[in-house]
Every structure is written in C-alpha cells, then in structure tokens.
A protein has these predicted regions:
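Active-site neighborhoods and metal-handling regions in enzymes and metal-associated proteins
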Residues: 1-470
Length: 470
C-alpha cells in the first residue's frame, strides 16, 4: 500500500474501551510436540545428534516455548536427541513444578533432578553428575551437539562465531570433554533468528496469550496516566497500574525528575512535578506497553526550549510512525523500515539509536529484522513491538510502544476460528486507529494493545491525543 504524507494534529477524545481479554488455556501438548518436531527437523538439517536448551530466570523463553516450563529462580536444561522422549533436567524446587508442562503430564517429556541447578547450599547429594546424565542420553565422541541459550554471534562479533557459546562454562566444558571442542556449536539461531527462528512464527494460541498480556499491560498504563496527579510519588503512580500476577518480561520502568535520564530506572520516590518529562512501562511475557511525554497540561507548562515539543518533535514522530505502520507487510525487508526512520527522523534531532522496532515473544526482545541494510523480510506470524525510541536533551521523548501481530489471510482465519473474541478486539482496534487516529494499516496488522497508538503529549491532559489530518 502507498501512504500519502500526513500532518499531525491533536484531537480531544475519550479513550475507547475494547473489552477485557480472558486468560487463554495453557499451550496444548500437541502444539508443544509440534514445536519439538520442527526443531528436530532443523537438527537433522544441520546433522546434529543432540540439542541442549538452557534456561534460567532471565533466559527462560526458548525452554518455555518447547516445554511449557520455565525454571523460575533455578537453572534447567532440556536434552533433545534425534529420537525418543526428551529429558528435562531441573533443580530441587522445580522438580514438582515440571507438572506445569502438558508434555510432561502426558508422558512426552521425562524429568531428572540435577541438584547443582538449585540455589546455593541446598542438598546436592542425591543426583548424578551432569557428565553421567549426558552419557546416559547417548552423548559420546561421535556426537555433534547444538547449544541453545539466549544469543548467537555473527562473524564480526567473534572470530569463531559458531563455537562461541553463552551457556555456563561447566556445561559447555563437559560437553566438549565428551564430544570434542569442534563438535559442540551454538545453535540458538534455530529458535531466535529473525528470518527463520521457530519463535518468530506465532500460532493462534500464542497470539491469544500475547493479546491477553497486552491488554493487562496497556490497561495498567492507562490507569497510571489517568490517575497521576502533581505531588504524587512515582511509587504511588505505579501502584495505580496494579499487576495481574503474570510474570514480568522486564523491570517496570518509571522515570521523571532526577531519574529522567536513566531510561531503565524504576520508581525511586520521585515526585510528579509539572514541567518535567516522564516515561513509564509495564511488560509481561509477550507484551510491553510504554508511553513517554511531559507532566503538563499544555505547552505553557514546558521549559522554554521545549515549548515547541508538539510541532517540533512529538508530532513529527507521530507522522513518520504512520508511514512505519504502512510498511508492515509480509515481504518488506527490515532495512526498509530502518531507512525510513533514519531518513525521516534524523539522528541529530531525534536520537534514535536502537533498532526502530523488534520482535517480541515471551522475552521482551527476541531479535529484530529491522536494522541497517537488513534484507530479512517481515513474515506472517511475527509479533512486532512498536518500539521506536526517540531521545532528546531538549524534548526528552515520546512513545507509542505496544505490540502487534503480522498475520496473513490464513493466520487471521485460524485466529478468528480459534479465538473469535480476541480477533474481534483486534479488528476494533484497527478500526479505531484508521477511523479516529487516521493511521492507515495494511490488512495484515493486528494491534494487541487496548491503547493502540494513543499518545497524549501532556499527561495532565490525557484526553488530548495525537492524530493525523484527514
């Protein structure tokens, strides 16, 4: 689709209600098994006899994707061979928690306790060594082992990228003692590469869960925006958001006053003061909702150098983001989105340093096809984060960060059949973005947030939001 350049405006609206999402059922054993089978097919293509998938509290997503289990505050390791039932190796306190996995409950996943995966000084005298476990799973000098952690490396990052493995040394050292150094390689890309990683193609079940957490996160941000008042502390504002109990995908951030320049900071007992910039986010597994603006009712409350914040900064950003949305079609090279942002929002003024958009999954940042000269095409099933972060010493920032799904006709039909209420809410959000905000969307774009592209420049006047001229 071609999109004509549009000029921003500020309109007065009541924020729409799109409805609450219902917590979807857990991922079925059949879907989990399909993921394992697909991964085994990739193993076969690379002539791997075994794959080990590591997880801990921070780096859980690959493990959870394959098993429905995350190791909470322990470590865990999935050992997958070319055939047979996979083995999940866990610590003391996760031994019972493995029951969260539908694969395990149906006998399609084995479990073994390896006590060194537990917290320090807990019992460690009732499990085999990791070498014994590996040997029992058939690893030997003839094995070729792929390791999956949380990142892989390019040739310019490491001189021997395929052998650079981020898993704990005590695991990798043991694997290499058994199979040899060159027969143990980094295979994280099989799940995380933006072009072909398995987790870059979401199923209807994943979309329904991501929509659920997106609704929870965005409704919390909405409550914070409408509830904040001058004189409150940042902790008090964050408390207004509330949390639903789902695991967080990253730390809650809230910056203002002395923390304004500390982008990843959480609340630090700063007061809400008129004339200060403010940014906030809440992130669950599969979602992240963030807004940035000013504690103000109008431009009259801003510092004099920032008085043209709407026309000179945030409005221009909104205009270009409408063009960014128009490029969200299967087949668009990621480099085209990067080039749009770099050319239309020059770094010297807008300071956009990170990728202008990335993939999100259970982890807040899966990977990104959007970078300089990227020829990685967007494809159906991608969960894309509208994460384009401007930064200015004068204007601070602005943001419309939420998530969306890129879904072709077939995937939309599957979602509509399996989760009709979820699909209907996505269509309502599309209609609002198009009819009220003036943002033209490709038919493949399914917004997941309940505050889709709603950006108030001044948080003390939240019903005044950006839109585009007709």
């Amino acid at each position: 689709m071609t999109v004509r350049a549009r000029t921003h405006r500020v309109i007065q609206i009541g924020w729409p209600e799109f409805g609450q999402a219902v917590y979807p059922p857990p991922t079925s054993s059949s879907e989990l098994q399909q993921r394992v089978d697909k991964l085994r097919a990739r193993m076969d293509e690379r002539k791997l006899t075994h794959l080990v998938v590591y997880g801990d509290r921070e780096h859980f997503a690959n493990l959870a994707y394959l098993t429905g289990f995350d190791p909470r505050f322990e470590e865990a390791l999935l050992i997958l061979s070319s055939h047979g039932t996979p083995l999940l190796v866990v610590g003391n306190e996760c031994e019972a928690y493995v029951g969260v996995s539908q694969l395990f409950n149906e006998g399609k996943l084995r479990r073994e306790r390896f006590q060194p995966f537990s917290l320090l000084n807990q019992p460690r005298d009732q499990s085999r060594t990791i070498r014994e476990i590996f040997a029992a799973e058939g690893l030997n000098a003839a094995s070729r082992v792929g390791c999956v952690g949380w990142k892989y490396f390019s040739d310019h990052e490491h001189p021997n990228a395929q052998y650079a493995i981020e898993l704990p040394s005590y695991l990798v050292d043991t694997l290499r003692e058994i199979a040899g150094h060159d027969r143990v390689v980094n295979s994280t890309d099989l799940l995380m590469h933006p072009g072909y990683g398995l987790r870059t193609v979401c199923t209807p079940a994943e979309i329904a869960y991501f929509e659920y957490t997106s609704v929870q996160a965005s409704e919390s941000v909405k409550r914070m925006i409408f509830g904040m008042r001058e004189g409150m502390t940042d902790h008090e504002v964050v408390a207004l958001g509330g949390t639903c109990g789902e695991p967080l995908g990253c730390h809650v951030t809230f910056t203002t006053g002395r923390t304004s320049a500390l982008g990843l900071s959480g609340p630090k007992d700063e007061r809400i003061v008129r004339g200060q910039p403010l940014s906030m986010n809440l992130c669950y597994w599969g979602s992240n909702s963030c807004r940035s603006g000013w504690v103000a009712s109008s431009f009259h409350d801003l510092p004099v150098p920032a008085a043209d914040y709407v026309a000179g900064f945030a409005g221009a950003y909104y205009e270009v983001m409408s063009e960014w949305f128009a490029l969200l079609k299967p087949g668009t090279p990621g480099g085209q989105l990067w080039r749009l942002i770099r050319e239309r929002l020059p770094f010297e003024r807008f300071g956009i340093f990170l990728n202008p958009g990335h993939l999100i999954h259970l982890d807040e940042w899966l990977s990104s096809p959007i970078y300089a000269n990227s020829d990685v095409p967007l494809h159906s099933g991608m969960a894309i984060q509208v994460d384009v972060i401007p930064s200015s010493p004068v204007y601070a920032s602005t943001r419309m960060e939420d998530g969306l799904i890129l879904a072709d006709k077939e995937l939309r039909k599957q979602l509509s059949d399996a989760f009709p209420d979820c699909y209907a809410r996505c269509q309502k959000r599309r209609k609002f973005m198009t009819d009220v905000l003036g943002i033209e969307l490709p038919e493949e774009v399914l917004p997941l947030s309940n505050i889709p592209a709603i950006v108030p420049p001044f948080f003390l006047a939240p019903n005044e939001v950006f839109a585009l001229e007709p």
